Swiss-Prot record:
<feature type="short sequence motif" description="Bipartite nuclear localization signal">
    <location>
        <begin position="198"/>
        <end position="216"/>
    </location>
</feature>
<dbReference type="GO" id="GO:0019013">
    <property type="term" value="C:viral nucleocapsid"/>
</dbReference>
<dbReference type="GO" id="GO:1990904">
    <property type="term" value="C:ribonucleoprotein complex"/>
</dbReference>
<keyword id="KW-1139">Helical capsid protein</keyword>
<keyword id="KW-1048">Host nucleus</keyword>
<keyword id="KW-0945">Host-virus interaction</keyword>
<comment type="function">
    <text>Encapsidates the negative strand viral RNA, protecting it from nucleases. The encapsidated genomic RNA is termed the ribonucleoprotein (RNP) and serves as template for transcription and replication. The RNP needs to be localized in the host nucleus to start an infectious cycle, but is too large to diffuse through the nuclear pore complex. NP comprises at least 2 nuclear localization signals that are responsible for the active RNP import into the nucleus through cellular importin alpha/beta pathway.</text>
</comment>
<dbReference type="Pfam" id="PF00506">
    <property type="entry name" value="Flu_NP"/>
</dbReference>
<dbReference type="GO" id="GO:0019029">
    <property type="term" value="C:helical viral capsid"/>
</dbReference>
<comment type="subunit">
    <text>Homomultimerizes to form the nucleocapsid. May bind host exportin-1/XPO1. Binds to viral genomic RNA. Protein-RNA contacts are mediated by a combination of electrostatic interactions between positively charged residues and the phosphate backbone and planar interactions between aromatic side chains and bases.</text>
</comment>
<protein>
    <recommendedName>
        <fullName>Nucleoprotein</fullName>
    </recommendedName>
</protein>
<dbReference type="GO" id="GO:0003723">
    <property type="term" value="F:RNA binding"/>
</dbReference>
<keyword id="KW-0167">Capsid protein</keyword>
<feature type="region of interest" description="Disordered">
    <location>
        <begin position="1"/>
        <end position="21"/>
    </location>
</feature>
<keyword id="KW-0543">Viral nucleoprotein</keyword>
<dbReference type="GO" id="GO:0042025">
    <property type="term" value="C:host cell nucleus"/>
</dbReference>
<comment type="similarity">
    <text>Belongs to the influenza viruses nucleoprotein family.</text>
</comment>
Length: 498
């Protein structure tokens, strides 16, 4: 799976479907983001937002959440059947921020879900355009990945907080489909499976009857998705064991945690896509850009180019640093929360700092925060270079294990070494190599021990000037080998709580 990423052109990596050629893929991705842009413009008209207000990222997020909520079939059905006080199952809304007399004011709006669905379909040639909805989900997921830590969720499932770099996409909804599955990290899949197994342990009927059969199918499908992310035969064989287990229990949980740890060095292939806020696509469409005709790719130069000429604003709390807020959103836009900071800094052209050093909280503003003191500033989302997004995980020498780092899942296909603290990782593998998976475990540990931190990943791959749209002249950066580049170092971010 990893090798495909390098053999196919980056346009083809987008839709996972090998059946379309590059031009068709670029057109269909273009149609998708164009639809998002048209929807956003229409919503701004409905809400009578000024140009400035329409470029406010908080307004964009509210509008995105409204359409996602309007199309959330399962939740809508649940709300119909379990009416709760003060929640109208047919309506959706959120905070919209407007500029009044030199101040920002919050206005809570409410819309019929039916109306939102109508506007969305109208913007998407009458179709449901599920791909566009998933795209918005991935943007929200990437923003969460950059903003929050998942320590508590990791600990609850018996995993180690140091495995945070495996948690990409951990807040994606279940209904995010194949595109969502592609961007989920190994840790995210492991966590979903462990939760499922734990329910089975606690609830006798979980695997039984008609429902149990559906549950079992879902379990096996998730196992296969995770198996597809691993790149070594031993890891895949262990996944087969977990999938085929008659009655999944603690042994399977152990195996899964073992596999998650192994992924710190024997990295899984996880896709990265630059998904931008709806307002960015809206701005481009409003200025007359025809996405479908021009074609678009989420893994090439296009998102970089779009961000070079888009001005997006954000509300800023009194003691926040606007540059730090910009970094947070830049990382979210490029799905770079788990990338090596050396690589991100080089591409962005300004230093990208670890989260522990950021003076900024999340992008969204809570309903009880005081608007009186809110200011707004321009987000600096431009970059110095662009680079192709990867889905390989960066293991060197074709499929063999290579150095991983306790905290990186590469986003950009750019040559670098992946420094890591082997002692820290290997310490987690003492003891238990008996049981049905013993030979696979031994093999995995052997591969990990043979991994060398000085090996170079993405050999010969470089970044490109923004004028080099055909990616003809790679500039291969040289990095300080010793400097470990984890975003989560000295972390003090808030937990992600629904």
């Amino acid at each position: 799976m990893a090798s495909q990423g390098t053999k196919r052109s980056y346009e083809q990596m987008e839709t996972g479907g090998e059946r379309q050629n590059a031009t068709e893929i670029r057109a269909s991705v273009g149609r998708m983001v164009g639809g998002i842009g048209r929807f956003y413009i229409q919503m701004c008209t409905e809400l009578k937002l000024s140009d400035y207000e329409g470029r406010l990222i908080q307004n964009s997020i509210t509008i995105e959440r409204m359409v996602l909520s309007a199309f959330d079939e399962r939740r809508n059905k649940y709300l119909e059947e379990h009416p709760s006080a003060g929640k109208d199952p047919k309506k959706t809304g959120g905070p919209i921020y407007r500029r009044r007399d030199g101040k920002w004011v919050r206005e809570l709006i409410l819309y019929d879900k039916e109306e939102i669905r109508r506007i969305w379909r109208q913007a998407n040639n009458g179709e449901d355009a599920t791909a566009g909805l998933t795209h918005l989900m991935i943007w929200h997921s990437n923003l969460n990945d950059a903003t929050y830590q998942r320590t508590r969720a990791l600990v609850r499932t018996g995993m180690d907080p140091r495995m945070c770099s495996l948690m990409q996409g951990s807040t994606l909804p279940r209904r995010s489909g194949a595109a969502g599955a592609a961007v989920k990290g190994v840790g995210t899949m492991v966590m979903e499976l462990i939760r499922m197994i734990k329910r089975g342990i606690n609830d006798r009927n979980f695997w039984r009857g008609e429902n149990g059969r559906r549950t079992r199918i879902a379990y096996e499908r998730m196992c296969n998705i995770l198996k597809g992310k691993f790149q070594t035969a031993a890891q895949r064989a262990m996944m087969d064991q977990v999938r085929e287990s008659r009655n999944p229990g603690n042994a399977e949980i152990e195996d899964l945690i073992f596999l998650a740890r192994s992924a710190l060095i024997l990295r899984g292939s996880v896709a990265h896509k630059s998904c931008l806020p709806a307002c960015v696509y809206g701005l481009a469409v409003a200025s007359g850009y025809d996405f479908e005709r021009e074609g678009y790719s989420l893994v090439g130069i296009d998102p970089f180019r779009l961000l070079q000429n888009s001005q997006v604003f954000s509300l800023i709390r009194p003691n926040e640093n606007p540059a730090h807020k910009s970094q947070l959103v830049w990382m979210a836009c490029h799905s770079a929360a788990f990338e090596d900071l050396r690589v991100s800094s080089f591409i962005r052209g300004t230093r990208v700092v670890p989260r522990g050093q950021l003076s900024t909280r999340g992008v969204q503003i809570a309903s009880n925060e005081n608007m009186e003191t809110m200011d707004s500033s321009t987000l600096e989302l431009r970059s110095r270079y662009w680079a192709i997004r990867t889905r390989s995980g960066g293991n060197t020498n074709q499929q063999r294990a290579s150095a991983g780092q306790i905290s990186v899942q590469p986003t950009f296909s750019v040559q670098r070494n992946l420094p890591f603290e082997r002692a820290t990782i290997m310490a987690a593998f003492t003891g238990n190599t008996e049981g049905r998976t013993s030979d696979m475990r031994t093999e995995i540990i052997r591969m990990m021990e043979n991994a060398r931190p000085e090996d170079v990943s993405f050999q010969g791959r470089g970044v490109f000037e923004l004028s080099d749209e055909k990616a003809t002249n790679p500039i291969v950066p040289s990095f300080d080998m010793s400097n470990e580049g984890s975003y989560f170092f000295g972390d003090n971010a808030e937990e992600y709580d629904n």
